[in-house]
């Protein structure tokens, strides 16, 4: 064995690798000897939360993953959904939380790079990106630095690669002070008959290394992503990867060309745990062994050890099982794109993962137990104490509700995110129909295609903390609702479950209940989960983040010319409310941000009502009755009306029902509701349709003038609303 493999395996070393004592004892039983240092690193990488899902796998299996349009669900690099005409959309969301807190630019950039590879590994050309970001309190000394670095990193990578960013979300809360969240989403288009998988097949076939050289960046990244932070966080900087979007663009083109050639048997990107994970996953899925020779791996640094090469997370790399008769043509493609193409091993029939380095065998492990048979835990969990319903009469009505509306529009929570998305290229590729800032981003399938895809990403973490089950339901419902506002049929979703330490029963309870809520909503709304990611141990010095189960979804428009957006209001339109008057103030931004009331149950999500209202909204959009649509969520009716006025630059004169106190009707966050701006002459017909479908529809106003005028309560000009809405973020960033 080489010197690095002669390192003594001590209890301290085992603990540094994130392995529990019982896990190490299981390793000893499994292999019948003490592991080498490199083998210890491999077990650490493959058995951590980031790669094995050992705390969440039991519960993830309960999610609905099948549907009429689902081609590939969880278990591959990305989910695959049929969109007709021989095409499919391939998509996934994944976290890069820990690296982005340590090194925000590179952490966020390589998060984008990793999810891009997940998508084009399947044979899809990326067409759209989103990101869901959570930062600490705006007055925390690191927050502005982290926002600037993360946004710059996302823009720097996605813009250079050439994929448009079409949506996303940002939250600020002190519970993210020590652990920010960076969740990146990418979707691509592929042919249904040209999807590529990671399952290796055939014995004695060449295993080929593709892409950039291997360095020491990211060594131990997967293990770091499965641990809490403490005061030694700055020492983890070397575990953050460094990305090169131009190399990734070349890798995309080379891979798609290789796939067109028909040379690919199986392919896997090198993400978390690098060469180790990609090789083990391909072999384990195909019931094959893998033998690698590290002397063949292209490296960019001298004297790299086997441990470093196996656990490096250098970016822009792939591993492929190749049809041997096409080696020459495949090699020529990669060299044409200036990328490395090196045969570093072969598939075997012995179900062993063997690694050679400088003539010696440094790894010899059972591949199935490393891969899809890693330990799975049924961790104890507890339910949170139920929050009482916050009654309307318990919530003070502030005297000047116009000032309240302006305050909320000019806040960290509710202000425009223009400062962020204007740093992203939202129009590259030329197919963007709806840019960020709307309910959902929309992209044409291709330049000469009538079809388009709608994308949204949603979660309300404060709801999830108060009631993880309802919060999980609401994340799905709001995503589904946002897609429906365009007229698109919601097809499927991907999840990104961000939580604290699952070894704490109260945190594990948040995860379990959120998954149950997500599953229930997805079943009722026919919105299957086809891919996803779990990020646990988001804690610093024992302080956990807010539970944040992000849901990103995709919908299909058969004819994008019938699409509507938030900004399409026309003078004289009737404004109608789908759903009842608002009344629920528990966990509302009115209660929290204006009155500092953090108690109370979140709004209940009636999934059957969500389904009925969404179907009705899509139907009337398809009939051509609607000029603009917007869902009602954070901030209730008041914020929704203000946003429509701001986006359309047209006024609305509205009147409340006066059945409830004004602050409840304006700022209640009851779910399953929409605002529609409709052609005035169809109002009576819409009322009849609503009655037939048992849908609550109320005319609450008209599009007129240049102010938001809510009778007897407030009058605010479009300019004043816009100034409040657009000014907070630039001021916060010092501009």
Curated annotation (Swiss-Prot):
Q: Which GO terms describe its molecular function?
A: ATP binding; magnesium ion binding; phosphoribosylformylglycinamidine synthase activity
Pfam families attached here? AIRS (PF00586), AIRS_C (PF02769), FGAR-AT_linker (PF18072)
Taxonomic placement = Bacteria, Pseudomonadati, Pseudomonadota, Alphaproteobacteria, Hyphomicrobiales
Q: Keywords in alphabetical order, please.
A: ATP-binding, Cytoplasm, Ligase, Magnesium, Metal-binding, Nucleotide-binding, Purine biosynthesis
Source organism: Bartonella henselae (strain ATCC 49882 / DSM 28221 / CCUG 30454 / Houston 1)
Q: What is this protein called?
A: Phosphoribosylformylglycinamidine synthase subunit PurL
Protein purpose: Part of the phosphoribosylformylglycinamidine synthase complex involved in the purines biosynthetic pathway. Catalyzes the ATP-dependent conversion of formylglycinamide ribonucleotide (FGAR) and glutamine to yield formylglycinamidine ribonucleotide (FGAM) and glutamate. The FGAM synthase complex is composed of three subunits. PurQ produces an ammonia molecule by converting glutamine to glutamate. PurL transfers the ammonia molecule to FGAR to form FGAM in an ATP-dependent manner.
Positions of ATP binding: 53, 92, 495, 532
Could you tell me where this protein is found in the cell? Cytoplasm
Enzyme active site: 50, 96 (proton acceptor)
Instruction: Enumerate the Gene Ontology biological process terms.
Output: 'de novo' IMP biosynthetic process
Quaternary structure, from the entry: Monomer. Part of the FGAM synthase complex composed of 1 PurL, 1 PurQ and 2 PurS subunits.
């Amino acid at each position: 064995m080489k010197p690095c493999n002669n390192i003594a395996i001590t209890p301290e070393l085992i603990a540094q690798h994130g392995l529990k004592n019982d896990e190490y004892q299981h390793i000893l039983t499994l292999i019948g000897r003490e592991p080498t240092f490199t083998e210890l690193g491999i077990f650490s990488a493959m058995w951590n939360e980031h790669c094995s899902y050992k705390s969440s796998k039991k519960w993830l299996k309960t999610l609905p993953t099948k549907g009429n349009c689902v081609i590939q669900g969880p278990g591959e690099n990305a989910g695959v959904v049929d969109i007709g005409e021989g095409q499919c959309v391939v998509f996934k969301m994944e976290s890069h939380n820990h690296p982005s807190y340590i090194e925000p630019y590179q952490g966020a950039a390589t998060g984008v790079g990793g999810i891009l590879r997940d998508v084009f590994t399947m044979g899809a050309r990326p067409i759209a990106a989103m990101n869901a970001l959570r930062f600490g309190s705006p007055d925390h000394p690191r927050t502005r630095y982290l926002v600037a670095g993360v946004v710059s990193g996302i823009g720097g990578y996605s813009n250079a690669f050439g994929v448009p960013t079409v949506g996303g979300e940002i939250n600020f809360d002190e519970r993210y002070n020590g652990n920010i969240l960076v969740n990146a989403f990418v979707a691509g288009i592929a042919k249904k008959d040209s999807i590529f998988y990671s399952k290796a097949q055939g014995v004695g076939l060449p295993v080929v290394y593709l892409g950039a050289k291997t360095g020491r960046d990211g060594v131990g990244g997967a293990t770091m992503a499965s641990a809490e932070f403490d005061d030694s966080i700055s020492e983890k900087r070397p575990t953050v990867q460094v990305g090169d979007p131009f190399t990734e663009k070349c890798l995309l083109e080379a891979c798609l060309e290789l796939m067109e050639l028909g040379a690919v048997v199986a392919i896997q990107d090198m993400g978390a745990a690098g060469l180790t994970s990609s090789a083990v996953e391909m072999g384990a899925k195909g019931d094959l062994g893998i033998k690698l020779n590290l002397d063949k791996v292209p490296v960019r640094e001298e004297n790299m050890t086997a441990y470093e090469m196996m656990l490096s997370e250098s970016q822009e790399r792939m591993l492929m099982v190749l049809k041997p008769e096409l080696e020459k043509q495949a090699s020529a493609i990669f060299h044409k794109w200036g990328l490395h193409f090196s045969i570093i091993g072969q598939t075997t029939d012995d179900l062993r993962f063997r690694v050679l380095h400088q003539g010696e065998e440094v790894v010899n492990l059972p591949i199935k137990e490393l891969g899809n048979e890693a330990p799975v835990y049924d961790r104890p969990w507890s339910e949170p104490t139920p929050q009482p319903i916050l009654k309307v009469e318990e919530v003070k009505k502030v005297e000047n509700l116009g000032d309240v509306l302006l305050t909320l529009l000019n806040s960290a929570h509710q202000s425009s995110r223009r400062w962020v998305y204007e740093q992203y290229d939202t129009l590259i590729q030329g197919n963007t129909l709806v840019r960020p800032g709307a309910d959902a981003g929309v992209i044409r399938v291709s330049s000469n295609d009538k079809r388009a895809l709608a994308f949204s990403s949603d979660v309300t973490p404060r709801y999830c903390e108060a009631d993880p089950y309802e919060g999980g339901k609401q994340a799905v419902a709001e995503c589904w609702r946002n897609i429906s506002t365009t007229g698109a049929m919601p097809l499927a979703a991907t999840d990104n479950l961000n939580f604290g330490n699952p070894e704490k029963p109260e945190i594990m309870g948040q995860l379990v209940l959120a998954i149950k809520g997500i599953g229930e909503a997805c079943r009722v709304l026919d919105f299957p989960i086809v891919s996803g990611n779990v990020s646990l141990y988001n804690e610093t010095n024992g302080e956990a983040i807010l539970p944040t189960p992000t849901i990103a979804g995709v919908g299909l428009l058969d004819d994008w010319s019938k699409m509507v957006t938030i900004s399409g209001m026309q003078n004289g339109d009737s404004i109608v409310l789908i759903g009842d008057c608002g009344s629920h103030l528990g966990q509302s931004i009115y209660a929290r941000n204006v009155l500092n009331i953090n108690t109370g149950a979140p709004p209940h999500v009636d999934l059957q009502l969500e389904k009925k209202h969404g179907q009705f909204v899509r139907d009337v959009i398809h009939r051509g009755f609607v000029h603009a649509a917007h869902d009602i969520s954070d901030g209730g009716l008041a914020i929704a009306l203000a946003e429509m006025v701001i986006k359309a630059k047209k006024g609305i004169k509205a009147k409340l029902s006066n059945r409830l106190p004004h602050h409840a009707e304006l700022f209640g966050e009851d779910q399953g509701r929409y605002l529609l701006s409709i052609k005035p002459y169809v109002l009576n017909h819409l009322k009849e349709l609503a009655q037939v479908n048992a849908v609550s529809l109320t005319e609450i106003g008209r599009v007129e003038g240049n102010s938001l005028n809510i009778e007897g309560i407030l009058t605010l000009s479009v300019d004043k609303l816009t100034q409040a809405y657009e000014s907070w973020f630039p001021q916060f960033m010092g501009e």
